[in-house]
Amino acid sequence: MPTKLPIPIEFRLPESWLPARPEGFDAVGVAFAAVHPRPDAGFAANITIDGEEPPASVTLADLANEPVERLRDVAESVEMAHRREVGSVDAPALTQRLAFTSVVDGTRRDLVQSQVYLSLSDIEDPHRHAVIRLVLTATAAQHDAVLGDFQDFVRTVRPDTETEA
């Protein structure tokens, strides 16, 4: 069952990506998932969205460390290949790329995750902040081919300006 995000967002999926049911070890807390229509050797690249309202004292780097530790519990040779703080003072963000080996459906796979952490303010209550995490997971062989789609997707994510009645 998908989890509700702490603040509503809107986004546009890349062309041909398909909404999917969140599954797997890291699906707890996932609000939305999508899969690439062309799997690589049986593994479908996927995009997931989750989020939380962290205490003010928690940094984006603190939040980004958590999935690294979770991956180390279930995967082999987890390596942080890249981490960079981006955005502005008013809208900070953090990107990181993780490479790891994991057994998925009985097959050992070299996977790469590109993660983006966006700090967003609630449109209706600007004092309320949430961090939205966007994650692309793909095989090492397919990652670079789908990364552009993920980057295009990230550019469409913003707080939802239409309120529910």
List each model region and its residues:
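Short beta-strand element of the conserved SAM-dependent methyltransferase core
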Residues: 34, 49, 96-98, 117, ...
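Surface-exposed amphipathic alpha-helical segments
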Residues: 15-17, 130-165
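Glycine-rich, often proline-containing surface loops adjacent to acidic residues and nearby aromatics
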Residues: 43-48, 92-95, 127-135
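Signature of long, low-cysteine stretches enriched in small and polar/charged residues
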Residues: 62-125, 151, 164-165
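Solvent-exposed residues in well-ordered beta-strands and their adjoining turns
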Residues: 52, 99-103, 137-139, 160
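Hydrophobic/anchoring residues in structured secondary elements
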Residues: 19, 83-85, 159
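Secretory pathway targeting signatures of secreted, lumenal, and periplasmic proteins
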Residues: 1-69
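A generic structural signal for short coil/turn motifs at secondary-structure boundaries
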Residues: 55-58, 105, 141-145
